Amino acid sequence: MIKEKLTIIGAGLAGCEAAWQAAGRGVAVTLHEMKPEKYSPAHHLPGLAELVCSNSLRGESLENAVGLLKEELRRLGSLFMEAALATRVPAGGALAVDRGLFSAFITDKIENHPLIEVVHGEVAEIPADGTVIVASGPLTSDALAASIGKYTGDYLYFYDAIAPIVTSDSIDLSKAFRASRYGKGDGDDYLNCPLDEAEYKAFIAALLAAEKVAAKEFEKVVHFEGCMPIEEMAERGLDTLRFGPMKPVGLIDPRTGIEPHAVVQLRQENREGTLFNLVGFQTKLTYPEQQRIFRTIPGLGKAEFVRLGSMHRNTFINAPQLLLSTFQLKREPRILFAGQITGVEGYVESAASGFLAGLNGARLAKGEALIVPPSVTALGALVNHITSAPAKHFQPMNINYGLFPDLAGRVKKKEKRAKLAERALTELDGWMNTL
């Protein structure tokens, strides 16, 4: 008879990863998910581990810290990475997935694990006893948020914006061209809609004059830089978008032989290639304004939008003030947190925090010593930031090489990232032997 038990609230990326890791270590898991009885404003699929903002898990190269984090998770036996590799779609140098297949893959694995029981329905209170992982996500329900507040005190709010999706057969291929930046991947994984200078200026002017969805007065709007609405970026200056999501660098229009003034990139959304999302085009414009303005983009004049952009509230705790490096709550160590509610930002980071919370949740339930990954690994760097950053100005953060400890000695700039990755994977391999 299994005595060790673990309760996990939330079956998103972090909750599912935590459940999988804990169950794999012999701990019985009760995984609570409020869907399909109740949906957040941004979720639509009935399955577990739903991807909301984008279908991209970002770059695969170890030149990017997120690529290193994915490689670490893959080596550690992450369910998230297993699902991602099994359901990937073409995306140049990035790892992108068919989000429907991705959710179905993880749902099947979780529901068929003998030590995991999935309970559907909203959890309004953190259980009063036992080991608990709170992985309720950035869209935590009001009732549960109130319960969390009893343990954490004040928590912060910010908004992410969701990008639109169009059907591939509604894209005018006589105006758009296929190419990946610098020819990465298969070289034609993205559709690109080029804009000349006049078209770009008209587009910016339309964005600045467009009607937006108003935020409620009691909610403070704080945008995370990695998911900022395009109209907010446009307000920063004429060329801000041209140096951001609309940058033309590395993209040559085959009809002109030169780089366009600006480019809107469309990334394949599903395996069949029938849907494409507008890369970096998160927005809080009203639906009519989105359709009007985005159809002025060359190639999208008759675009069929299967999903328009929208805004939703995100909730996260002040992790440096509240959490230990083991993801335990300082004032009540039987409670752990995981996922975006901790202030990690991004799919991969959420899964990574779930991996570590699941590992330590299982150890806590079994009475074993808890562990923290080496600080030189991507996992360790992420943990260190989340739990050690200045609490006064704490904001969500993606993994990046700026969070890693410096290398010993002098290293050429162009070699630094490769050396950081090499050091991380060497340390990770040694750490894995202790698990």
UniProtKB/Swiss-Prot annotation:
Pfam families: GIDA. Its cofactor is FAD. The keyword Transport does not apply. GO terms for biological process: tRNA methylation; tRNA wobble uridine modification. One of its GO terms (molecular function) is tRNA (uracil(54)-C5)-methyltransferase activity, 5,10-methylenetetrahydrofolate-dependent. Its EC number is 2.1.1.74. It comes from the Bacteria. FAD binds at residues 10-15. It catalyses: uridine(54) in tRNA + (6R)-5,10-methylene-5,6,7,8-tetrahydrofolate + NADH + H(+) = 5-methyluridine(54) in tRNA + (6S)-5,6,7,8-tetrahydrofolate + NAD(+); uridine(54) in tRNA + (6R)-5,10-methylene-5,6,7,8-tetrahydrofolate + NADPH + H(+) = 5-methyluridine(54) in tRNA + (6S)-5,6,7,8-tetrahydrofolate + NADP(+). One of its GO terms (cellular component) is cytosol. InterPro entries: FAD/NAD-bd_sf (IPR036188), MnmG-rel (IPR002218), MnmG_N (IPR040131), TrmFO (IPR004417). It is found in: Cytoplasm. Its main location: cytoplasm. Keywords: Cytoplasm, FAD, Flavoprotein, Methyltransferase, NAD, NADP, Transferase, tRNA processing. Disulfide bonds: none annotated. Catalyzes the folate-dependent formation of 5-methyl-uridine at position 54 (M-5-U54) in all tRNAs. Belongs to the MnmG family. TrmFO subfamily. This is Methylenetetrahydrofolate--tRNA-(uracil-5-)-methyltransferase TrmFO.
